Amino acid sequence: MTNIRKTHPLLKIINSSFVDLPAPSSLSSWWNFGSLLGVCLGVQILTGLFLAMHYTSDTATAFNSVTHICRDVNYGWLLRYMHANGASMFFICLYLHVGRGLYYGSYTYSETWNIGILLLFAVMATAFMGYVLPWGQMSFWGATVITNLLSAIPYIGTELVQWIWGGFSVDKATLTRFFAFHFLLPFIVAALVMVHLLFLHETGSNNPTGIPSDPDMIPFHPYYTIKDILGFLIMLTVLSVLVLFSPDLLGDPDNYIPANPLNTPPHIKPEWYFLFAYAILRSIPNKLGGVLALVMSILILAIVPILHMSKQRSMMFRPLSQCLFWLLVAILFTLTWIGGQPVEHPYIIIGQTASVLYFLIILIFMPATSLMENYLLKW
């Protein structure tokens, strides 16, 4: 008799995705981040659901409701810090996942890659709106500064900002709609994840060599299920240590001050995972130019497949491209550091230099190096 997992209409979908899925035999730990992101999303939706049961999206009570969650709700502090630090883990896994895709040439699966970029934007939007909800100083001023960027859009900018605010400033209407969207978006992200996996399973996984692995495939279960479970345990251990020992390590102390429209914090900055983009935004003196650079810093990923000039898919056997890739990583770390610094000398010029190099490496140096490597290999 055929196994029920291969015949049942629902179980056979799960079976073909997670049990009998043919997977390359050479996948390294860099391929763990997809499943880790799935766990992060699950943790965020669960903790977020329980937080939403106690949170009130009203300017008068939002800050106090978060305090109430931490002090009076059973394990409310754990839920709150798991959710806040879970977002950091989410972005660490996201950036490593994208970095893996860039290094090993996974972007040549264009549908999977483009859905991934959509997912990145959706998760960033969700995280931004979530940061506004505790209604602390950085929540309020972060929301004001970032939404105000839309006023740089010619002709419709001002009206657009007021439409998003629901008034003439960030206020009760803004907080309520941000809560509604923050609740809704993770489920849209979950749906996009399904589409992401659907397109991935059409082509099959890439592997570290970048060479087609059709002759050498192994079943996903038990080999990669056990490997993924090890990844889950490591990530959840790191998250637990962060939550239980230093829950405020990655947060901003200003967010423990209730939002006050009459008092601007000395340094307005977003959460650490947006600092690289914030540094690129600030490095351009013109408002519209800054906004365009900000959007392009992420959207540039969409043209990476077009800029792929190498005859090889992966960077595994391309030492010159590897050097450029790690230089790009160093530049992203530099931009993250600069984003958290005040706008003064020497930080301004460092940020501008790093921003220019970021775009130059992706748009010019990487394709040029690929062509040179082709020439050196007489291809």
UniProtKB/Swiss-Prot annotation:
Q: What is its main location?
A: mitochondrion
Indicate which residues the UniProt annotation says bind a ubiquinone. H201
- Where exactly are the transmembrane stretches of this chain? 33-53, 77-98, 113-133, 178-198, 226-246, 288-308, 320-340, 347-367
Q: Which UniProt keywords apply?
A: Electron transport, Heme, Iron, Membrane, Metal-binding, Mitochondrion, Mitochondrion inner membrane, Respiratory chain, Transmembrane, Transmembrane helix, Transport, Ubiquinone
Q: Does the keyword Magnesium apply?
A: no
Cofactor binding description: Binds 2 heme b groups non-covalently.
Question: Which coenzymes or cofactors are required?
Answer: heme b
Cell location: Mitochondrion inner membrane
> A single Pfam family, by name?
Cytochrom_B_C
Q: Could you say which residues bind heme b b562 here?
A: H83, H182
Q: Which domain of life is it from?
A: Eukaryota
Binding site residues for heme b b566: H97, H196
Task: Provide the membrane topology annotation.
Answer: Multi-pass membrane protein
Per the record, the GO terms for biological process are: mitochondrial electron transport, ubiquinol to cytochrome c
Q: What is this protein called?
A: Cytochrome b
